[in-house]
Amino acid sequence: MSNYKEIAWQGLWKNNPGLVQLLGLCPLLAVTATLTNALGLGLATVAVLIGSNVLVSLVREFVPKEIRIPVFVMIIAALVTVVQLVINAYAYGLYLSLGIFLPLIVTNCVIIGRAEAFASRNSVGAAAFDGLMMGTGFTAVLAVLGAVREILGQGTLFDGADQLLGDWAASLRIELWHVDNSFLLAMLPPGAFIAMGLLIAGKNVIDKRLEAKKPTPEAAPAITRARITKVG
């Protein structure tokens, strides 16, 4: 159980793919203009991460080390194709919004990195849980970044939620304030870089405060040595 707790802690916070490893920055910065797009890409990434970790863990004993990377990439590409077809069939609006970044999940270093560093060395259960935690941590960063950019840029939240969840989700849209013109800096890549930097800085501040609260180990008492100068 403690091993699974460590996997969760690593994926959600300590070794978060977005805030610590800084992997997958291209889609992370390009697709997070709205919370809906961020959640859509995040959920797709979670599905591929779990599936690829499970399959890699299952075939790890049968794949020669010399060709393991091409095999892992083929597994990931097959799963991304399945996810892409599912989104195309059931969430076509989201499929159009994500565009090229959906098939580019194949090249996401988070996925191939976990397949190589963890799934190929651990059991199926641990690999699946690692994929879930790493994917959830990555999705959380996407969601926070998407929410911040959407609020600052458009004054809304969950705009276009019907593209992800269906027609009923159109009622989830929240207009926090009315803006005649969008705040372009928040919607464009420079704003995404600034927001990402602030998120990383915030995490570092929290980590330092948590580290400062840890009790410092007490120093061992010094050993005093008595010097004998006279015998008898």
Swiss-Prot record:
GO terms for cellular component: plasma membrane. InterPro entries: NqrDE/RnfAE (IPR003667), RnfE (IPR010968). Its main location: membrane. One of its GO terms (biological process) is electron transport chain. It is a multi-pass membrane protein. It is found in: Cell inner membrane. The chain crosses the membrane at residues 18-38, 39-59, 69-89, 93-113, 128-148, 182-202. Keywords: Cell inner membrane, Cell membrane, Electron transport, Membrane, Translocase, Transmembrane, Transmembrane helix, Transport. Its EC number is 7.-.-.-. It holds the Pfam family Rnf-Nqr. Belongs to the NqrDE/RnfAE family. Part of a membrane-bound complex that couples electron transfer with translocation of ions across the membrane. PANTHER family: ELECTRON TRANSPORT COMPLEX PROTEIN RNFE, ION-TRANSLOCATING OXIDOREDUCTASE COMPLEX SUBUNIT E. The complex is composed of six subunits: RnfA, RnfB, RnfC, RnfD, RnfE and RnfG. This is Ion-translocating oxidoreductase complex subunit E. The gene is rnfE.
